[in-house]
Amino acid sequence: DEEECKIAFLLNDRYADGTDISWIWDVDFEALARQSARFTRILVSGVRADDMALRLKYAGFDTGRIEVIRDYENLLEAIGADETPTFIMPTYTAMFDLRGEISKHTDIKAFYE
């Protein structure tokens, strides 16, 4: 499906995620880079956002389109800026961090509630 969308990569390296993030170099992000024309925004966040942005650069993403967003509140603003669907690819703890931020603004409860 070639529908336009936003894509967000959230990379943490906390204990529950695994502190070794070298696995990002084994993932075929090049396949996504070949489809990058359909991404209206390429968002990167998380504790290791800079490492993720670097990996996307080497995968062939246009670095001028990669947006590193340091906090989840601003990330949610970017995601909600329009009605374009967003695909979020988080590591384990990033998923819970983002869900916690979402719970501040919606009826969705934080995972532990």
Question: Which residues make up each language-model segment?
Answer:
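ATP-dependent carboxylate-amine ligase
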Residues: 1-113
